[in-house]
Amino acid sequence: MHENFDKRLELLLEGLSLTRRFLFDPEEKETELKNLEQLSIQDSFWDDVSRAGRISEKIARLKQQLLEYNELKNKINSIKFFLEDEESSKDLEIQKELEKEFIFCEKKIAEWETLRLLAGELDRNSCFLSINAGAGGTESCDWVEMLFRMYSRWANSHGWKVEVIDRLDGEVAGIKHITLKLIGEYAYGYAKAESGVHRLVRISPFDSNAKRHTSFASVEVFPEIDDKIEVEIRPGDIRIDTYRSSGAGGQHVNVTDSAVRITHFPTGIVVSCQSERSQIQNREACMNMLRARIYQKLLQERLEKQNTNRKEKKEISWGSQIRNYVFQPYTLVKDVRTGYEVGNIQAMMDGELLDAFIKAYLADYGEIT
């Protein structure tokens, strides 16, 4: 037991060292925090509410990161202290407590090692996630709603805020199309692994003959970008349409034409938003999404040229099938890109196992710092 603990401690110390070296320099973060706190106490701080909000969020994030880092460092030092003490290391009760501390520290180190794979230009950003029903009619619409639930639960487990930007319900049940905004650090870095077609195989609850059906839903993920990134959108290249916001069952939740749809002719990209209170706000949200999608398209084209000799030759296209979810005659979720699979489909649909699939993807395709 003691020998096993020694080896695990060695790995934890190595992981902590790599974290300091490549991901999180606590001294650097402390300096950044102090500088931002000095800004926040200036009389003019709230003159620019948007900027003040971003700085306040950054301060809170830095405080949380430093808290987590120091907690981990203290736990590892505590483990080291008890293992070096001959009497304590032989105590069974202390060994049980050490095991709990090891599990906590190993999990945290694993999370931070995953962040090392998120070195893309926009990986740290919030993101938009759109789910669209494919072939399969009502069954596919129900599949979209199931994926919406899975992603919402998964995002909440990461502490991200989930906003519904646009939604179109199915004629009988489910959802034809939905766009979410996942607000939080590294939301795009994680969620980008989900872009592609998701295939469902099950006995349909909408079929009185209880036949097995195959349905499809496509997921598209694109990062939120700030005003520092310039994306040219000429007025003549877009068409702006307005319509009434609608809720479940097609019932109008707003009697004015406040929802906005923007079509970008050069790329064929269409974005829509009905979540805001006014047409002006929805139009602004649409333009932000359009800028993000155009920028992502440009990035993707650039990466495709750069990656001709890299691992990405495995051909991951945005429209390709990436994962199968089989409910009957057996239960299995399998990622066709990595080969990773699990049998507990209910835990998967509850959002509890999605991280394992994403980490497998990042191990193959992520950019390492």
UniProtKB/Swiss-Prot annotation:
Originating organism: Chlamydia muridarum (strain MoPn / Nigg)
Keyword Cytoplasm assigned: yes
Additional observations: The gene for this protein contains a UGA in-frame termination codon after Leu-23; a naturally occurring frameshift enables complete translation of RF-2. This provides a mechanism for the protein to regulate its own production.
Name this protein carries in UniProt: Peptide chain release factor 2
Post-translational modification note: Methylated by PrmC. Methylation increases the termination efficiency of RF2.
Key words of the record: Cytoplasm, Methylation, Protein biosynthesis
Cited function: Peptide chain release factor 2 directs the termination of translation in response to the peptide chain termination codons UGA and UAA.
Cellular component aspect of the GO annotation: cytoplasm
NCBIfam families assigned to the protein according to its UniProt record, in alphabetical order: prfB
Residue positions, PTM N5-methylglutamine: 251
